[in-house]
Regions:
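Active-site-adjacent structural elements that line small-molecule/cofactor binding pockets in enzymes
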Residues: 1-169
Length: 169
């Protein structure tokens, strides 16, 4: 088991996890190693950006269903505090938080190059981390979902690793 920052938490909040993660390692007498920290992100890759955006950012699709449910559950369990995880900026008014906004800001989606670029941008916001955990959502379209995982494994991650100067362990 290891430490994972959730896919539904905005990147600016996830960036605050790294200093605490490293502090925890230090306090436990472990080497300070961000590569032991994992980030989960909702990701969808398609052969073209239009297909990916239509599938992953449609409020009535599987990603929309996921964000609708997680927002309802966190709002019920944590009240307005739960909405904070979805805010694009800390002072964003609660009434401006929406599923549409989450799909636009928390789902990495597009063609191969789009997704590579979005992952590298995420890395710049968050800082170094070990594994990127691809969070897929209900496979409403099985061939499209399978293709997304294939593109992620065979096209996206090799390009991300090359850009970061890392091997694909």
């Amino acid at each position: 088991w290891g430490d994972i920052s959730s896919n539904y938490v905005q990147a600016h909040w996830v960036a605050t996890h790294l200093p605490k993660f490293v502090e925890g390692q230090r306090n436990a007498g472990l080497p300070e190693d961000p590569s032991q920290w994992s980030i989960a992100k909702s990701i969808f890759v398609a052969d073209n950006a239009d297909t990916a955006i239509k599938y992953a950012r449609d409020e009535s699709g599987p990603y929309g269903f996921y964000f609708t449910n997680i927002q309802k559950k966190l709002l019920k369990g944590r009240g307005a505090m739960g909405l904070g995880l979805f805010k694009v900026y800390p002072d964003q008014p609660d009434e401006d938080v929406s599923v549409h906004q989450s799909l636009e800001t928390q789902v990495i989606a597009g063609g191969v190059e789009d997704v590579v670029e979005q992952i590298l941008e995420l890395r710049q916001i968050i800082g170094p981390f070990g594994q990127l955990m691809y969070t897929g959502h209900d496979w409403a379209d099985i061939p499209l979902s399978r293709r997304s995982m294939e593109l992620m494994a065979h096209e996206v991650m090799p390009r991300v690793n090359k850009a970061l100067g890392e091997s694909a362990d």
